[in-house]
Amino acid sequence: MLEQTLDHLQALVSFDTRNPPRAITTGGIFDYLRDNLPGFNVEVIDHGAGAVSLYAVRGTPKYLFNVHLDTVPDSPHWSADPHVMRRLDDRVVGLGVCDIKGAAAALVAAANASDGDAAFLFSSDEEANDPRCIAAFLARGLPYEAVLVAEPTMSEAVLAHRGISSVLMQFAG
């Protein structure tokens, strides 16, 4: 499955999803994901101001995987085109491979390697600290037991990360 993941990663890196300038549309990377998630019910939503999300569901999953697709702006100090993934020995280089197109590629490869229930929310508004995609998703009130957010955390599970949170609490007494 590594080669399939790297193939998807190469494609995902080729899409310019820098944020700013928030020029992401419902095409491009979202067309690629839609085309590579066969068997999923896919919904692409434009939330305005360059914030786009793709919600994909197959079956009746208990968990949702969330991945943002936007990247930080590139730098003039890149030694090669940042939108062309390069393999260097045991690593790959390209804009967004770590944060976090690599996780998106792995999820797409895993989804294609099985026919199990799965749910994904791909968003494009994380880098600008304008959580339109997540806020709109939370407003839908979909009943997942947990959401797993893909972020580079040095392979450590974390229970909180910068961003927004949503809590539903009940008190008695």
What is the predicted function of each stretch?
Residues 29-39, 55-59, 80, 106-115, ...:
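Alpha-helix C-terminal capping segments
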Residues 64-122:
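Active-site metal-coordination/substrate-binding segment of hydrolases
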Residues 96, 100-171:
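Acidic/histidine-rich catalytic neighborhood of metal-dependent amide-processing enzymes
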